[in-house]
Regions:
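A Lys-centered signature of the CheY-like receiver
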Residues: 126
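Active-site residues of response regulator receiver
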Residues: 73-75
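Non-catalytic signal-transmission and effector/linker regions of two-component phosphorelay proteins
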Residues: 1-21, 27-42, 64, 129-148
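Hydrophobic/aromatic residues positioned on beta-strands within the core alpha/beta folds
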Residues: 101-103
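Short, glycine/charged-rich "phosphate-handling" switch motifs in NTP-dependent
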Residues: 121
């Protein structure tokens, strides 16, 4: 069943729409990210998906309508992890130009290397305080250029 929402409609009707898809299964991290992104720039539309398989499903739906300006993926999610999602996205060439950032509590060099090889722009560690989260969110937003 297609997931239709205001973000999809806006992405379709308004080229350059500031829409970010975030794969995050932790409700606390979702709430913190939503708060910080909104505080930095409330013009962004944020959509959270809580498992890897649904991230792929949602992106395939968007492929027909509009594209996110940024994809942020938690590394450790149910059904597919961040690296597995990146691998799936390699089969969908339309997403090649969409920046993808992995964020994780794991500082594994192996995870980071694999994700960068699979097309992530960066692999960032989830910060432990609001100042760090704000810095990471600003950094993530820097990848989301309206001119893409």
């Amino acid at each position: 069943m297609p997931l239709k929402g205001s973000a999809e409609i806006a992405a379709t009707e308004h080229p350059g729409y500031k829409y970010i898809l975030l794969g995050e299964d932790d409700i606390d991290d979702e709430e913190l990210l939503r708060e910080v992104f909104t505080r930095i720039d409330s013009s962004f539309s944020l959509e959270f998906v809580n498992n890897g398989r649904d991230v792929i499903t949602r992106l395939k739906e968007l492929e027909k309508h509009g594209m996110p300006c940024l994809i942020v993926l938690d590394y450790n999610m149910p059904t597919l992890n961040g690296a597995e999602i990146l691998q799936e996205l390699k089969r969908l060439p339309r997403f090649d130009q969409v920046p993808k950032i992995i964020w994780s509590t794991s500082n594994s060099d192996t995870y980071k290397t694999v994700c960068l090889q699979l097309g992530a722009c960066d692999y960032v560690i989830k910060p432990s305080n609001m100042q760090g989260l704000t810095e990471v969110a600003r950094y993530m937003l820097s990848f989301c250029s309206v001119s893409r």
